[in-house]
Amino acid sequence: MLAKRIVPCLDVKEGKVVKGVQFRNHEIVGDIVPLAARYAEEGADELVFYDITASAHDRVIDKSWVSRVAERIDIPFCVAGGIKTIAQAREKLAFGADKISINSPALTDPSLIERLQDEFGRQCIVIGIDSYFDAQSNSYKVKQFTGDEAATKDTQWFTQDWVQEVQKRGCGEIVLNVMNQDGVRQGYDLKQLSIVREICDVPLIASGGAGTMAHFKDVFEIARVDAALAASVFHKGIIDIGELKNYLFENSIAIRR
Protein backbone atom coordinates (compact mmCIF):
# COMPACT_ATOMS: atom_id res chain seq x y z
CA MET A 1 0.00 0.00 0.00
CA LEU A 2 1.29 3.44 -0.92
CA ALA A 3 1.89 5.72 2.04
CA LYS A 4 -0.65 8.47 2.61
CA ARG A 5 0.62 12.04 2.37
CA ILE A 6 0.23 15.03 4.67
CA VAL A 7 0.22 18.26 2.67
CA PRO A 8 0.24 21.71 4.29
CA CYS A 9 -1.33 24.35 2.08
CA LEU A 10 -0.03 27.90 1.94
CA ASP A 11 -2.41 30.43 0.40
CA VAL A 12 -0.40 33.40 -0.86
CA LYS A 13 -1.73 36.93 -1.29
CA GLU A 14 0.44 39.98 -1.92
CA GLY A 15 3.58 38.07 -0.95
CA LYS A 16 2.29 36.77 2.39
CA VAL A 17 0.71 33.52 3.54
CA VAL A 18 -2.93 34.10 4.44
CA LYS A 19 -5.88 32.01 5.61
CA GLY A 20 -9.60 32.61 5.43
CA VAL A 21 -12.81 30.79 6.28
CA GLN A 22 -14.84 29.42 3.36
CA PHE A 23 -12.48 31.35 1.04
CA ARG A 24 -13.32 34.72 2.65
CA ASN A 25 -11.93 37.18 5.25
CA HIS A 26 -8.28 36.28 4.83
CA GLU A 27 -5.80 37.19 7.55
CA ILE A 28 -2.01 37.16 7.32
CA VAL A 29 -0.44 34.18 9.07
CA GLY A 30 3.23 34.47 8.12
CA ASP A 31 5.99 34.73 5.54
CA ILE A 32 6.26 32.22 2.71
CA VAL A 33 9.77 30.82 3.02
CA PRO A 34 9.98 30.48 6.85
CA LEU A 35 6.61 28.70 6.96
CA ALA A 36 7.63 26.38 4.13
CA ALA A 37 10.88 25.55 5.93
CA ARG A 38 9.04 24.91 9.19
CA TYR A 39 6.63 22.44 7.62
CA ALA A 40 9.41 20.64 5.78
CA GLU A 41 11.32 20.27 9.05
CA GLU A 42 8.20 19.02 10.87
CA GLY A 43 7.83 16.17 8.38
CA ALA A 44 5.38 17.33 5.71
CA ASP A 45 5.41 15.08 2.66
CA GLU A 46 4.96 17.94 0.24
CA LEU A 47 3.64 21.51 0.14
CA VAL A 48 1.08 23.30 -2.00
CA PHE A 49 1.20 27.03 -2.65
CA TYR A 50 -1.83 28.86 -4.04
CA ASP A 51 -1.54 32.46 -5.21
CA ILE A 52 -5.22 32.90 -4.52
CA THR A 53 -5.89 36.11 -6.47
CA ALA A 54 -3.66 35.51 -9.50
CA SER A 55 -6.33 34.11 -11.83
CA ALA A 56 -9.01 36.58 -10.75
CA HIS A 57 -6.61 39.49 -11.33
CA ASP A 58 -5.24 38.08 -14.61
CA ARG A 59 -1.65 37.64 -13.49
CA VAL A 60 0.63 34.73 -12.68
CA ILE A 61 2.55 33.54 -9.60
CA ASP A 62 5.58 35.60 -8.61
CA LYS A 63 8.52 33.41 -9.59
CA SER A 64 10.89 35.04 -7.07
CA TRP A 65 9.41 33.28 -4.06
CA VAL A 66 9.16 30.00 -5.98
CA SER A 67 12.94 29.97 -6.38
CA ARG A 68 13.49 30.95 -2.74
CA VAL A 69 11.30 28.10 -1.54
CA ALA A 70 13.14 25.64 -3.81
CA GLU A 71 16.47 26.73 -2.35
CA ARG A 72 15.25 26.25 1.23
CA ILE A 73 13.31 22.96 1.29
CA ASP A 74 14.05 19.42 0.15
CA ILE A 75 10.52 18.06 -0.23
CA PRO A 76 8.30 18.29 -3.34
CA PHE A 77 6.09 21.31 -3.76
CA CYS A 78 3.32 22.37 -6.10
CA VAL A 79 2.42 25.91 -7.16
CA ALA A 80 -0.82 27.34 -8.50
CA GLY A 81 -2.13 30.69 -9.56
CA GLY A 82 -2.87 32.10 -13.00
CA ILE A 83 -0.90 29.53 -15.00
CA LYS A 84 -2.53 29.41 -18.41
CA THR A 85 0.29 28.84 -20.91
CA ILE A 86 3.02 26.27 -21.51
CA ALA A 87 5.64 28.99 -21.08
CA GLN A 88 4.32 30.04 -17.67
CA ALA A 89 4.26 26.44 -16.48
CA ARG A 90 7.77 25.79 -17.77
CA GLU A 91 9.07 28.86 -15.93
CA LYS A 92 7.65 27.72 -12.59
CA LEU A 93 9.07 24.23 -13.02
CA ALA A 94 12.44 25.70 -14.03
CA PHE A 95 12.47 27.80 -10.86
CA GLY A 96 12.15 24.67 -8.75
CA ALA A 97 8.49 23.65 -8.44
CA ASP A 98 7.90 19.91 -8.79
CA LYS A 99 4.28 20.19 -9.89
CA ILE A 100 1.99 22.86 -11.22
CA SER A 101 -1.69 23.09 -10.37
CA ILE A 102 -4.37 24.74 -12.44
CA ASN A 103 -7.92 25.51 -11.46
CA SER A 104 -9.75 28.50 -12.94
CA PRO A 105 -7.66 28.56 -16.16
CA ALA A 106 -8.66 24.95 -16.86
CA LEU A 107 -12.33 25.87 -16.49
CA THR A 108 -11.86 28.68 -19.00
CA ASP A 109 -9.91 26.47 -21.42
CA PRO A 110 -10.10 22.73 -20.66
CA SER A 111 -7.70 21.94 -23.51
CA LEU A 112 -4.95 23.52 -21.39
CA ILE A 113 -4.85 20.28 -19.39
CA GLU A 114 -4.02 18.25 -22.49
CA ARG A 115 -1.37 20.70 -23.67
CA LEU A 116 0.36 20.71 -20.29
CA GLN A 117 0.18 16.94 -20.05
CA ASP A 118 1.67 16.53 -23.52
CA GLU A 119 4.51 18.91 -22.69
CA PHE A 120 5.44 17.90 -19.14
CA GLY A 121 3.79 14.54 -18.43
CA ARG A 122 0.72 13.97 -16.33
CA GLN A 123 2.76 13.26 -13.18
CA CYS A 124 3.29 16.98 -12.57
CA ILE A 125 -0.14 18.27 -13.61
CA VAL A 126 -2.53 18.78 -10.69
CA ILE A 127 -6.09 20.01 -11.07
CA GLY A 128 -7.64 21.99 -8.24
CA ILE A 129 -11.43 21.89 -8.02
CA ASP A 130 -13.33 24.36 -5.83
CA SER A 131 -16.53 22.48 -5.06
CA TYR A 132 -19.51 23.60 -3.01
CA PHE A 133 -22.77 22.00 -1.99
CA ASP A 134 -25.71 23.78 -3.58
CA ALA A 135 -28.69 23.16 -1.30
CA GLN A 136 -31.20 24.39 -3.88
CA SER A 137 -30.27 21.69 -6.40
CA ASN A 138 -29.03 19.22 -3.76
CA SER A 139 -25.83 18.74 -5.74
CA TYR A 140 -22.13 19.58 -5.74
CA LYS A 141 -21.07 22.28 -8.18
CA VAL A 142 -17.81 23.96 -9.22
CA LYS A 143 -16.95 27.62 -8.69
CA GLN A 144 -14.30 29.68 -10.49
CA PHE A 145 -12.04 32.61 -9.46
CA THR A 146 -12.66 31.88 -5.78
CA GLY A 147 -9.64 33.80 -4.51
CA ASP A 148 -11.47 37.11 -4.90
CA GLU A 149 -15.01 37.39 -3.58
CA ALA A 150 -15.96 40.00 -6.17
CA ALA A 151 -14.72 37.83 -9.04
CA THR A 152 -16.06 34.44 -7.86
CA LYS A 153 -18.62 32.93 -10.18
CA ASP A 154 -20.59 29.74 -10.69
CA THR A 155 -19.73 27.45 -13.58
CA GLN A 156 -21.79 25.08 -15.68
CA TRP A 157 -20.04 22.08 -14.14
CA PHE A 158 -21.31 19.65 -11.57
CA THR A 159 -18.34 18.47 -9.52
CA GLN A 160 -18.54 14.81 -10.52
CA ASP A 161 -18.74 15.68 -14.21
CA TRP A 162 -15.72 17.98 -13.97
CA VAL A 163 -13.73 15.31 -12.10
CA GLN A 164 -14.34 12.92 -15.00
CA GLU A 165 -13.56 15.57 -17.60
CA VAL A 166 -10.17 16.55 -16.17
CA GLN A 167 -9.14 12.91 -15.90
CA LYS A 168 -10.10 12.32 -19.52
CA ARG A 169 -7.93 15.27 -20.51
CA GLY A 170 -4.86 13.96 -18.70
CA CYS A 171 -4.45 15.33 -15.18
CA GLY A 172 -2.16 13.48 -12.80
CA GLU A 173 -3.81 14.38 -9.47
CA ILE A 174 -6.94 16.11 -8.23
CA VAL A 175 -7.22 18.37 -5.19
CA LEU A 176 -10.86 18.63 -4.15
CA ASN A 177 -11.31 21.89 -2.25
CA VAL A 178 -14.62 21.64 -0.39
CA MET A 179 -15.65 25.27 0.02
CA ASN A 180 -18.40 24.67 2.59
CA GLN A 181 -15.88 23.06 4.95
CA ASP A 182 -12.94 25.40 4.36
CA GLY A 183 -11.42 26.81 7.53
CA VAL A 184 -14.24 25.73 9.85
CA ARG A 185 -12.30 22.74 11.26
CA GLN A 186 -15.37 20.49 11.54
CA GLY A 187 -13.94 17.62 9.50
CA TYR A 188 -13.55 16.79 5.83
CA ASP A 189 -16.65 16.28 3.68
CA LEU A 190 -16.47 12.50 3.76
CA LYS A 191 -19.66 12.07 1.77
CA GLN A 192 -18.53 14.16 -1.18
CA LEU A 193 -14.99 12.79 -1.11
CA SER A 194 -16.28 9.22 -1.06
CA ILE A 195 -18.49 9.92 -4.08
CA VAL A 196 -15.57 11.43 -5.98
CA ARG A 197 -13.26 8.58 -4.93
CA GLU A 198 -15.52 6.12 -6.77
CA ILE A 199 -15.01 7.93 -10.09
CA CYS A 200 -11.42 9.10 -9.57
CA ASP A 201 -8.65 6.92 -10.97
CA VAL A 202 -5.81 9.34 -10.21
CA PRO A 203 -4.51 10.32 -6.76
CA LEU A 204 -7.16 12.28 -4.86
CA ILE A 205 -6.23 14.93 -2.29
CA ALA A 206 -8.80 16.05 0.28
CA SER A 207 -8.92 19.73 1.17
CA GLY A 208 -11.14 21.65 3.56
CA GLY A 209 -12.26 20.95 7.11
CA ALA A 210 -9.37 19.43 9.09
CA GLY A 211 -9.63 20.31 12.77
CA THR A 212 -8.40 17.28 14.70
CA MET A 213 -6.09 14.34 14.14
CA ALA A 214 -9.14 12.08 13.99
CA HIS A 215 -10.35 14.02 10.95
CA PHE A 216 -7.23 12.93 9.07
CA LYS A 217 -7.72 9.32 10.12
CA ASP A 218 -11.34 9.41 9.00
CA VAL A 219 -10.61 10.88 5.58
CA PHE A 220 -7.97 8.22 4.91
CA GLU A 221 -10.07 5.33 6.22
CA ILE A 222 -13.54 6.31 5.03
CA ALA A 223 -12.99 8.38 1.89
CA ARG A 224 -9.82 6.47 0.94
CA VAL A 225 -8.04 9.57 -0.33
CA ASP A 226 -4.34 9.49 -1.16
CA ALA A 227 -3.39 12.69 0.65
CA ALA A 228 -4.90 15.17 3.09
CA LEU A 229 -4.30 18.87 2.68
CA ALA A 230 -4.76 21.32 5.54
CA ALA A 231 -3.85 24.87 6.42
CA SER A 232 -5.21 26.55 9.55
CA VAL A 233 -4.52 23.64 11.93
CA PHE A 234 -0.86 23.81 10.95
CA HIS A 235 -0.58 27.60 10.70
CA LYS A 236 -2.10 28.08 14.17
CA GLY A 237 -0.13 25.25 15.79
CA ILE A 238 -3.26 23.25 16.60
CA ILE A 239 -1.70 20.11 15.12
CA ASP A 240 2.00 19.24 14.89
CA ILE A 241 2.81 17.28 11.74
CA GLY A 242 5.18 14.87 13.48
CA GLU A 243 2.64 14.10 16.20
CA LEU A 244 -0.07 13.68 13.55
CA LYS A 245 2.02 11.13 11.70
CA ASN A 246 2.67 9.19 14.90
CA TYR A 247 -1.07 9.19 15.63
CA LEU A 248 -1.90 7.93 12.14
CA PHE A 249 0.78 5.23 12.34
CA GLU A 250 -0.60 4.07 15.69
CA ASN A 251 -4.03 3.86 14.04
CA SER A 252 -2.74 1.61 11.25
CA ILE A 253 -2.65 4.26 8.53
CA ALA A 254 0.26 3.76 6.12
CA ILE A 255 2.24 6.98 6.50
CA ARG A 256 5.78 8.20 5.85
CA ARG A 257 7.63 8.90 9.11
Curated annotation (Swiss-Prot):
This is Imidazole glycerol phosphate synthase subunit HisF. GO terms for cellular component: cytoplasm. It comes from Shewanella sediminis (strain HAW-EB3). IGPS catalyzes the conversion of PRFAR and glutamine to IGP, AICAR and glutamate. The HisF subunit catalyzes the cyclization activity that produces IGP and AICAR from PRFAR using the ammonia provided by the HisH subunit. The gene is hisF. Heterodimer of HisH and HisF. Belongs to the HisA/HisF family. It is found in: Cytoplasm. It comes from the Bacteria. It catalyses: 5-[(5-phospho-1-deoxy-D-ribulos-1-ylimino)methylamino]-1-(5-phospho-beta-D-ribosyl)imidazole-4-carboxamide + L-glutamine = D-erythro-1-(imidazol-4-yl)glycerol 3-phosphate + 5-amino-1-(5-phospho-beta-D-ribosyl)imidazole-4-carboxamide + L-glutamate + H(+). Its EC number is 4.3.2.10.
